[in-house]
Amino acid sequence: MYKDRDVNQRDSRFENQQDGFKKNSNFRFFKRKSCKFCDSGKHPDYKEFDFLKKFITEQGKILPKRITGTSAKHQRRLALEIKRARYMALLPFVKK
């Protein structure tokens, strides 16, 4: 039914797939960061600008939730409070 050459080609393709799986086996799973606000029960506040500085890069950009580990609800609130603190001149818009 199958020629010998066809069977060998299929085996070589299967071996290549196994090599591909071995490459992906080095993938590491990271522990999900917990939200600092959910754990402590605190809410972000624009008056606590020293605490808000932890969520801003050196250029003054707001860090995303995948880096900070905050929940979606608190990330939205955090962005709002950072923008309020910027407007009140407690935090800089852009760092020089």
UniProtKB/Swiss-Prot annotation:
GO CC term, one of those recorded: cytosolic small ribosomal subunit
PROSITE patterns to which the protein is assigned, alphabetical: RIBOSOMAL_S18
Pfam (any one): Ribosomal_S18
Any one Gene Ontology molecular-function term assigned to this protein's record: small ribosomal subunit rRNA binding
GO biological process: translation
Assigned keywords, A-Z: Ribonucleoprotein, Ribosomal protein, RNA-binding, rRNA-binding
Cystine crosslinks: none
Family: Belongs to the bacterial ribosomal protein bS18 family.
The protein's role, per its UniProt record: Binds as a heterodimer with protein bS6 to the central domain of the 16S rRNA, where it helps stabilize the platform of the 30S subunit.
Subunit structure: Part of the 30S ribosomal subunit. Forms a tight heterodimer with protein bS6.
Xref: NCBIfam families: S18 (TIGR00165)
Protein name, UniProt field: Small ribosomal subunit protein bS18
Taxonomy of the source species: Bacteria, Pseudomonadati, Spirochaetota, Spirochaetia, Spirochaetales
Gene: rpsR
